Amino acid sequence: MCIRDRLAMALYGGSVTSRLFLNVRERDHLCYYCASSFQSFTGSMAVNSGVEHADAARAEAAILKELDDLRTGPITDEELEDCRLSLLSGMAGIEDSLGGIETWYYMEVLRGSGLQTPDEARAALRAVTKEDVRAILRQLSLSVSYLLTREEGIADV
């Protein structure tokens, strides 16, 4: 996963300032939790949410609408910077320990896209634009959607 992907995921559903958290969860009250994640080794993105069965269709529609809105609508400077600062904050302590450095470079090797130092990654993150984010999100399409629910007649434990 490149740094642009990480910012796109943070904006869509990977942080408490994301569209999924602020709109689908907080504003619309359609789920208990709602978050996106990017699987860097498969190139797939997932959205996980906890919803009431009766709200499942509305929640799915709202989740997909937020993705479409990010692809085509306005992205405010404030929301982009909030997500960028959140990621930069998470990267701040990488070089504070040998384990942090080791983990950073281990993941860089596994990704196979060339080694990038933490400083280079932070600089790249600072350079990501709204259009970069839109371009990443435009590449996504719905592949599968499923709803896990309990069987009728099974008592809550």
Locate predicted features.
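M16/MPP (pitrilysin/insulinase) zinc-metallopeptidase core fold and M16-derived inactive scaffolds
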Residues: 14-29, 41
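M16/insulysin-pitrilysin zinc metalloprotease superfamily fold
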Residues: 15, 35-94
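Active-site lining segments that contact anionic ligands and/or coordinate catalytic metals
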Residues: 27-31, 42-46, 142-143
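Conserved small/polar residues in nucleotide/adenosyl-binding loops
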Residues: 1-5
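C-terminal regions of mature proteins
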Residues: 83-157
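Buried hydrophobic packing residues in well-ordered domains
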Residues: 6-8, 24, 63, 87, ...
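Amphipathic alpha-helical interaction elements
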Residues: 9-13, 68, 72, 110, ...
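Short amphipathic beta-strand starts and helix->beta connectors
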Residues: 27-34, 129-132
